[in-house]
Amino acid sequence: MTNTTLAATSTQKVLIVEDEGEMCLVLNLILDGKEFELDHVQNLLAADRYLKKNKPSVVILDNQLPDGFGVDFIGQIKKNYPTIKIIMISGFDSSFKAVALKNGADVFLEKPFTKTQLYNSINELLK
């Protein structure tokens, strides 16, 4: 049995940028009770507004959003907020992985991903 405890010892802010309600629910269920303060927005404009007022430790960023592609937003996050860690999630094939990582994503997870993959990714980023 694998122990998947998270490194967070105090409340860490995590912003979820995802427009699909079902995926938001899954992410919230996975991270609920794990010492995180979870916030959620459904598009890039809302994410930009959020980041101007809040500084999450981690952004979980979907690629395909109503107002653009998350992969294109990564550079803006890294330029303006270089300490924020980014986990890019995408249902597209892994060809997006290289672009996402080149643009500054710290982790790329292809949908569907496991709870353990998400835990391990966040754990590593918060060390």
Language-model features, listed with the residues they occupy:
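Non-catalytic signal-transmission and effector/linker regions of two-component phosphorelay proteins
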Residues: M1-L15, S57, T116-K127
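Conserved acidic carboxylate
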Residues: E18
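Two-component/phosphorelay signaling modules centered on CheY-like receiver
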Residues: G21-D39
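Acidic, metal-coordinating helix/loop segments flanking the phosphotransfer/catalytic sites
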Residues: H40-V58
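Acidic catalytic/metal-coordinating carboxylates
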Residues: N43, F69-D72
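Active-site residues of response regulator receiver
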Residues: D62
